[in-house]
Design a protein with these regions (language model features):
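Glycine-rich phosphate-binding loops of nucleotide-dependent enzymes
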Residues: 1-136
Length: 136
């Protein structure tokens, strides 16, 4: 719980109210965690969940993820994608930086190809496959 609210400004809530707020926020996005669990006792996936809850707690509307699945199992990746889809449905903009084309196609609406720091092309993923993306 402290990991989520540390550094926030404004009115401080009591621990019970804070716990309830974090649990409600987590439930609305499918981010179930144990608020009192210590970070050193968490899996990589749980730590990632805490980081996402942190930005949501602060009211962020844009989430930027750099290689978010690099150390996740396939099950953890699918869980993360479910969370991201729910966030998108609730109005969050999500930017994912990755080299995993199959994941790009499964989670995104559109993709921008970058080479040497320059934007090459942006395409809708609905009509794309991995081969087309590599040819851009």
């Amino acid at each position: 719980m402290d990991n989520i609210v540390l550094g926030t400004k404004g009115k401080r809530l009591g621990r019970k109210a804070l716990r309830e707020k974090i649990e409600a926020l987590g439930q609305s996005f499918g981010l179930e965690i144990e608020p009192e669990k210590k970070v050193y006792d968490m899996s990589v996936s749980e730590k990632q969940t805490v980081e996402i809850l942190k930005v949501l707690y602060r009211g962020a509307q844009i989430l930027i993820l750099d290689e978010p699945t690099a150390v996740l199992t396939p099950q953890e990746t699918e869980r993360l994608f479910k969370i991201l889809r729910r966030m998108r449905e609730q109005g969050c903009a999500i930017i994912i930086i990755t080299h995993k084309l199959n994941e790009v196609l499964s989670i995104s609406d559109r993709v921008t190809i970058l080479r040497k720091g320059k934007s090459i092309e942006t395409v809708e993923t609905a009509g794309c496959d991995e081969k087309k993306l590599t040819e851009l």
